[in-house]
Amino acid sequence: MLDYIWLDDESPILQQVPVEYSSAALIFSPFIQMPEGWENAKRKNDYEHIYPNDNEIRGIGKAVSWKKVMSSCGFQTHAELALALMTSIGALRDEFAREDLAEVLHENINGDLYYPSEDHISNFHIPSLVKVLGANGSNRFYYAEPIVENRGVLDITEANLRTVLDEAATELVLTDEKMDFVFMSVYDSFINVFLAKDKNIHELVERMGWEAMICDESTYISWYR
């Protein structure tokens, strides 16, 4: 199976992955909209940090696109929203941080709307992951977590993917048993990296309903800078 790939910002993504993967895309994890009044019902005191757990997200959460949040904030690009998100969690060095964008984002995150899943693969992507991992006839998928040295193989079902995502640490890689497709979480970010052996993945990305940026030969993991 394929090990997790530690992508750096010294060279483009497609230069750092195994040569058999000719295509890559950055998949934006959706924001999470909970029902109106949900946070107030959960809150026990004014200082408590409230964020929905996996079961709550899957049960009553709704996916909200980056484009919708960009529109609310007046941002023109996905890069601006990425900078706002990463600045707000302290993931960027001072020279790259954009406190002005983070402030605008903060002002527009309200009404039981929450940040996307940080460091992890979004629960909202589980149904499409089942479709992609089984697209070429695979019945099982591999998973690996390099930090905790946990890996295994399971049947491709939503239940098994839920279990893996719920228990995963930060870095996680998923592949079908033929290793035609790869899905990786990225630490300190709100995106996932999708790799495919097929040269053209535009149609697949659109069919899965992913909000994404298709990588070209010059796309870096620090694409937002």
UniProtKB/Swiss-Prot annotation:
Superkingdom to which the source organism belongs: Bacteria
One Pfam family here: DUF2711
The protein depicted here goes by the name Uncharacterized protein YwbB
Could you tell me which species this protein originates from? Bacillus subtilis (strain 168)
Upper classification of the source organism reads: Bacteria, Bacillati, Bacillota, Bacilli, Bacillales
